[in-house]
């Protein structure tokens, strides 16, 4: 099933698995998005949000085996800025994070 250019009510992230000795990049986060009272979710190794307030989002989703959870296909997730440009964020982006200044 597909959600097309929809607004969202809430977007929250929760730490699902803590980081290992290798660092925070191995930590697994659950991303939960609420649209029209329905919860959609996916897992990512990035804790930052894939969409920001005021943006429209599109994604493909399917029920889990129990029929209880709506799982987002992370690779299909798109956020649209106000000008309509597609924003690719998270661990799918090809841009490097800015380096800290020392």
Locate predicted features.
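Short acidic/glycine-enriched loop/turn segments that link adjacent beta-strands
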Residues: 24-29, 66-68
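Structural detector for short beta-strands of small beta-barrel domains
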Residues: 1-27, 88-90
């Amino acid at each position: 099933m597909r959600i097309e250019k929809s607004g969202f009510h809430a977007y929250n992230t929760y730490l699902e698995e803590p980081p290992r000795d290798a660092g925070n990049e191995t930590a697994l986060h659950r991303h939960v998005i609420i649209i029209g009272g329905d919860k959609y979710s996916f897992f990512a190794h990035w804790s930052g949000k894939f969409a920001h307030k005021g943006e429209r989002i599109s994604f493909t989703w399917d029920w889990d085996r129990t029929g209880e959870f709506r799982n987002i296909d992370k690779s299909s997730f798109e956020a649209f800025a106000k000008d309509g440009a597609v924003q690719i964020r998270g661990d799918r982006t090809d841009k490097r994070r800015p380096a800290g200044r020392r």
